[in-house]
Amino acid sequence: MSNTPIELKGSSFTLSVVHLHEAEPEVIRQALEDKIAQAPAFLKHAPVVINVSGLESPVNWPELHKIVTSTGLRIIGVSGCKDASLKVEIDRMGLPLLTEGKEKAVRPAPVEPATPSEPPQNANPITKTRLIDVPVRSGQRIYAPQCDLIVTSHVSAGAELIADGNIHVYGMMRGRALAGASGDREAQIFCTHLTAELVSIAGVYWLSDKIPAEFYGKAARLRLADNALTVQPLN
């Protein structure tokens, strides 16, 4: 037990950043509600950082703050603010001004105009899959929209995997796995070593202490049955 009443430790958290490109409150509200409706398990009541670098002065920050929080999102900080008067307004509301890591600029490849062609008859639909073949480290969040997510390496504690479809982890799974993020109740989670902090399918979740002991650290398959999470051996 520590001899001091408090202890400060460095840590990292995975947060979504909402980049605002429009200052009209009603436009922002509708856009946010549309995004939340696409992935409610991922975004509903989520803590977010608001990036205002794309907004032109003047900005009605109290009104923007009211609109964003009315959608259920929880603002924990603001980034990208260069306007001195706006900084004062944000500070008055008790929100920290944050500095984000710089992103590498990516030059878009030239796009050749496509030649119209007849679609093939009886073509099978292609289901996209996002493949990650490197370790997923603490603090990282990987999202696979409208597809399955496959990770062929380890997932560290504090990392987060999110997919609108299924999630497959062929390594040690210590982080959080959220399948069916857009509400697909048929989604499943497959792990070769299940030691997750949290598993969730379409918003129905277990914390690590709810995972049955006989499946902890084992190869397992999770899915919904009668609106409840179930787990079985992965053979």
Swiss-Prot record:
Instruction: Provide a GO biological process annotation.
Output: regulation of cell septum assembly
Q: Does the keyword Cell division apply?
A: yes
Q: Where is this region: Disordered?
A: 104-125
In terms of superkingdom, the source organism counts as: Bacteria
Ranges in coiled-coil conformation: none
Q: Which Pfam families match?
A: MinC_C, MinC_N
- In which residue ranges is the amino acid composition biased (Pro residues)? 110-119
Keywords (alphabetical) are:
Cell cycle, Cell division, Septation
Gene3D superfamilies from the entry?
A: 2.160.20.70, 3.30.70.260
According to its UniProt entry, the function of this protein is described as: Cell division inhibitor that blocks the formation of polar Z ring septums. Rapidly oscillates between the poles of the cell to destabilize FtsZ filaments that have formed before they mature into polar Z rings. Prevents FtsZ polymerization.
Q: Which family does it belong to?
A: Belongs to the MinC family.
How would you summarize the oligomeric state and partners of this protein?
Answer: Interacts with MinD and FtsZ.
Q: Which HAMAP family does this UniProt record tie to the protein?
A: MinC
What is the protein name for this chain? Septum site-determining protein MinC
Q: Which organism is it from?
A: Salmonella typhimurium (strain LT2 / SGSC1412 / ATCC 700720)
